[in-house]
């Protein structure tokens, strides 16, 4: 949704809780980078809050609305803590912390003090004007964390090319930590390719990006033009600017190639595929993708898994 430029939209234009969605809304910003913070790394979470303003995290929410009650929520102190085996079912944004926030503010007996200050999506009627505390000892707080590290204006690029509207659903690989992947697109006009985006599925990933012009079939992938390389500290979604723009002509088929090494992984390439009921209607016929173990012998990704590779391209008109 966010990586595909379908959002975000302003809450005033699509209010929470009205059970309606305005399909005519367009993104008011373009999200170009999202980093994943490792589970329960509270210091990294605090650092990200300080640097970027907020960290999205998942909790088990026993409340069903802003008016609900729960043994895990102390309404008088706006303090929540769940300890148990239930899986996360709700996202909130960590916007601050208080290491000395008393454990006595919670309904649960806890080992120590400390809490994150979080903002919910239920409006000003919940908590203290929409904010509340979640104990450091909550089972799920800080386990699944995303921080939005590059949010740009909507005029940053003229075009986005993509076939993975659902984004990172699963992973593909050759039972080793490296893989080549290529997505093929058709230029809408006379353009200059400026950047590509992809997912690093684990920390400390190294990448190389290439472009292939005048793509005809997989043999065209022998003519890769190097455009960028680097190393990424965290798992996440990244947009990388090319070292030089690559001009393509209207109607020209071209490929963006990603070579990625993710230490410890055996399936380092992020893919979109029909994994469950939530993704069973995903369009897997809108893309053309190839994979390779060594960069010389390529096969269509559909021969391995009916899927789309999560590689996008960005261009400007010329």
Residue ranges and their predicted role:
Residues 149-152, 214, 312-318:
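Short beta-strand-to-coil "C-cap" segments at the C-terminal boundary of structured domains/repeats
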Residues 96-98, 196, 211-216, 260, ...:
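Residue-level signal for short segments within beta-strands and strand-turn junctions
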Residues 259-318:
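Short, surface-exposed beta-strand/loop patches at domain edges
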Residues 204-284:
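Aromatic- and Gly/Pro-enriched, solvent-exposed loop/edge beta-strand patches characteristic
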Residues 142-154, 239-242, 285-291:
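Short, surface-exposed secondary-structure junctions/capping segments
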Residues 1-115, 119, 124-202, 230-234, ...:
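Predominantly the structural core of cysteine protease catalytic domains
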Residues 33-36, 192, 208, 226-231, ...:
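Ser/Thr- (and often Asn-) enriched beta-sheet segments in non-cytosolic proteins
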